[in-house]
């Protein structure tokens, strides 16, 4: 994926999700204020959701334990740095329930939500399976929350 001409632009996101175990809706809700590269922490106290009637809302984390200040490694901090440097924000950033400065936006200037990333993951797997004989199973952003690396992070607390 890192060297793929199409999907290399999502490498940092996949890396962050895999190495932190962050839920995709938590990642989508991250704003520039939540990321402290100097102290290598990420504040996770909310998530971005899009309702069935297409409204964007901020909700608290899924559980009380989900509210946390997540320490990040140097390599994860570097991935966030790349995302921040390459961030393509609209001229006027939308505020969702008082939050603005999201990391990724769609063509309409709205923050990306879990569904956007699910589509990207489906396309990444499809491209891989078109190229390689050994097929990759369908993956979802939610799967990253249960990775062994994520479990190690969670057990550190």
Locate predicted features.
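Short, contiguous acidic/charged loop-to-helix segments that flank catalytic cores in large enzymes
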Residues: 2-5, 57-67, 105-114, 129-143, ...
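Flexible loop/turn segments at secondary-structure boundaries
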Residues: 51-52, 111-112, 148
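Basic, Lys/Arg-rich DNA-contacting stretches centered on the C-terminal catalytic core
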Residues: 2-4, 25, 38-71, 75, ...
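Active-site/catalytic core of tyrosine-dependent DNA strand-transfer enzymes
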Residues: 73-132, 151
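Basic, Lys/Arg- and aromatic-enriched nucleic-acid-binding interface segment
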Residues: 1-24, 28-30, 38, 67, ...
């Amino acid at each position: 994926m890192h060297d793929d001409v199409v999907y290399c632009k999502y490498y940092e996101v996949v890396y962050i999700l895999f190495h932190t175990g962050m839920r995709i809706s938590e990642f989508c809700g991250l704003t520039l204020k939540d990321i402290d590269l100097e102290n290598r922490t990420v504040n996770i106290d909310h998530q971005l959701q899009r309702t069935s009637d297409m409204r964007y809302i901020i909700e608290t984390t899924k559980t009380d334990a989900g509210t946390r200040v997540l320490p990040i490694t140097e390599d994860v901090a570097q991935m966030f740095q790349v995302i921040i440097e390459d961030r393509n924000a609209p001229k006027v950033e939308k505020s969702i329930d008082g939050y603005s400065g999201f990391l990724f936006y769609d063509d309409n200037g709205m923050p990306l939500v879990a569904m956007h990333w699910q589509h990207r993951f489906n396309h990444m797997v499809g491209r891989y399976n078109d190229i390689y004989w050994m097929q990759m199973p369908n993956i979802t952003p939610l799967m990253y929350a249960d990775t062994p690396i994520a479990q190690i992070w969670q057990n550190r607390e």
